[in-house]
């Protein structure tokens, strides 16, 4: 698995590896100096998805995401890679090659180069929080809200290719939005959706029986971090998010 360090990504990983134990976890930091890692902790009393309902209290979500971490069973190799170094670290690539990987599961912030993808027997799949091809790149859950189009919030599971979020689509899913949700509720629901559909996509790729839909790359846009400003972030308060969902559902 290749993951980032934001709590939602780590939350997905924590639950995923409790059932599907990977050979190794490559965790990218939030910054180029290796800062921003969610630290590995003891596996005792690990937090789990705490509710299957829609009306999840904000404080419960805060507890889940503020205290969640990646389990690291003793036989799972764990690498930490500073942001921007994934495709440049020759020692890391050597170790990946030696692990004889079947498939790469990606849920991280950095594009994975073809050299690493080719090291896995069946290539890789990416968990993209956004509905490709309309919303590719970064912050693609926030942009639909800023565009007042919450109907475009969802998850895309696609095969990895050399570009950013452009690979053939295996699965897409949308959350059942509720009018009393904050952005954190949306994030939580996407984590659960990902956990439900990634194993299906993984098994299909491994069995060679996957049905894919090629993306029409003439549609939509690829968004980059520099476009998402502090002004954008300040706009997405609970009242704004709830209002966008209410307008969509009415």
Residue ranges and their predicted role:
Residues 1-250:
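One-carbon transfer enzymes
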């Amino acid at each position: 698995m290749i993951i980032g360090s934001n709590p939602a990504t780590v939350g997905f990983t924590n639950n995923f590896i409790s059932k599907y134990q990977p050979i190794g976890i490559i965790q990218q930091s939030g910054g180029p100096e290796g800062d921003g890692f969610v630290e590995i902790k003891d596996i005792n009393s690990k937090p789990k998805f705490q509710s299957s309902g829609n009306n999840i209290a904000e404080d419960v979500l805060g507890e889940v995401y503020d205290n969640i971490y990646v389990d690291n069973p003793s036989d799972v190799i764990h690498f930490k890679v500073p942001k921007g170094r994934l495709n440049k670290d020759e020692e890391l690539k050597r170790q990946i090659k030696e692990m004889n990987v079947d498939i790469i599961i990606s849920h991280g912030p950095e594009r994975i180069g073809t050299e690493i993808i080719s090291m896995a027997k069946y290539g890789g799949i990416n968990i993209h929080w956004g509905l490709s091809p309309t919303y590719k790149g970064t912050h693609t859950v926030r942009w639909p809200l800023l565009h007042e189009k919450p109907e475009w919030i969802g998850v895309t599971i696609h095969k990895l290719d050399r570009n950013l979020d452009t690979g053939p689509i295996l699965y897409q899913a949308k959350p059942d939005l509720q009018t009393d949700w904050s952005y954190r509720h949306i994030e939580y629901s996407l984590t659960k959706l990902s956990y439900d559909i990634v194993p299906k996509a993984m098994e299909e790729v491994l069995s060679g029986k996957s049905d894919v839909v090629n993306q029409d790359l003439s549609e939509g846009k690829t968004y980059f971090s520099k476009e998402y400003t502090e002004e954008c972030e300040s706009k997405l308060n609970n009242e704004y998010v709830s209002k966008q969902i209410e307008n969509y559902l009415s």
